[in-house]
């Protein structure tokens, strides 16, 4: 079985692609929900292709077409386009109903063409449905919130980014104790703490600046701190989940989407957990 060797990119390529990704992220936060839908869809499609390619390295099957169709349909469903009537009214029940329908369809396919790996294929496809397009679609919900949508998106994204940056810097400077040596030897307890601390510091400052510019901040003070820490913790869990998957497959990067930074899943792994966690918290707080 072939394993993909890591690519050694020049430092200049890593830095340049890193800045491109950073400004693209700011653009996503700034734009309105309909405008960012194509960006989210593109990330979802590329992520699915990377996911299917990694499973093939293990000699495993996945219903890639089913994953891609779900990704295309779940975004209009999240945007509420089903309320427009016509053929789109099939999307009106929402993405959760769409997930149930696709899950049932997968089992029907398995029953029609049973083979030794039928249930394994269903399981891997369901994991892909939830992990990539479903979780990613909550970015649209956060940005679409009335009044606080801009601030909520900024709060969630900055909390995730702070978790990544703080974890990297603190881990390089003070990392001593491995957090998950079997999954990712480079990640340390000190790095995880650094990510949480930076998120706790970034969230309230960002909300203060946001209000100073005339926008509406969804949370303030201690509330913003607690929110930032919770989202950062979810982001770190998402990072570890992707490390678990890559360790199981036997690859260093999920792809070559960004030079020196790996694939799309390598870049959005933290967001895939941080964004839905942030939206859930906003719902629990009555802000969504």
Question: Where on the chain are the PLM-derived regions?
Answer:
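Short helical (or helix-break) motifs at transmembrane helix termini and adjacent helical loops
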Residues: 161-172, 235-247
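Hydrophobic alpha-helical transmembrane segments of integral membrane proteins
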Residues: 129-130, 255, 272-273
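Juxtamembrane boundary at the C-terminal end of a transmembrane helix
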Residues: 280-288
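Membrane-embedded alpha-helical bundles of polytopic integral membrane proteins
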Residues: 1-229
């Amino acid at each position: 079985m072939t394993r993909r060797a890591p690519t050694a990119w020049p430092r200049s390529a890593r830095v340049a692609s890193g800045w491109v990704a950073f400004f693209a992220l700011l653009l996503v936060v700034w734009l309105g929900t309909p405008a960012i839908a194509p960006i989210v869809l593109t990330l979802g499609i590329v992520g699915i292709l990377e996911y299917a390619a990694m499973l093939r390295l293990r000699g495993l099957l996945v219903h890639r077409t089913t994953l891609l169709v779900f990704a295309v349909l779940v975004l209009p469903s999240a945007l509420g386009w089903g309320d427009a009537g016509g053929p789109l009214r099939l999307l009106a029940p929402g993405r959760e109903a769409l997930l149930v329908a696709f899950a049932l369809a997968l089992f029907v396919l398995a029953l029609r063409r049973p083979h030794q790996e039928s249930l394994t294929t269903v399981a891997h496809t369901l994991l892909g449905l939830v992990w990539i397009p479903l979780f990613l679609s909550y970015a649209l919900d956060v940005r679409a919130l009335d009044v606080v949508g801009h601030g909520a998106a900024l709060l969630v994204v900055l909390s995730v980014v702070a978790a990544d940056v703080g974890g990297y810097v603190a881990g390089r400077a003070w990392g001593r104790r491995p957090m998950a040596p079997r999954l990712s030897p480079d990640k340390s307890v000190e790095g995880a703490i650094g990510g949480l601390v930076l998120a706790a510091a970034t969230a309230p400052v960002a909300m203060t600046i946001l209000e100073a510019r005339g926008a509406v901040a969804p949370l303030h003070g201690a509330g913003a701190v607690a929110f930032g820490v919770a989202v950062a913790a979810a982001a770190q869990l998402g990072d570890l989940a992707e490390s678990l998957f890559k360790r199981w497959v036997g690859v260093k990067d999920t792809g070559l989407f960004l030079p020196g930074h790996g694939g799309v899943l390598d870049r959005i792994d933290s967001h895939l957990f941080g964004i839905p966690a942030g939206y859930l918290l906003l719902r629990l707080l009555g802000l969504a």
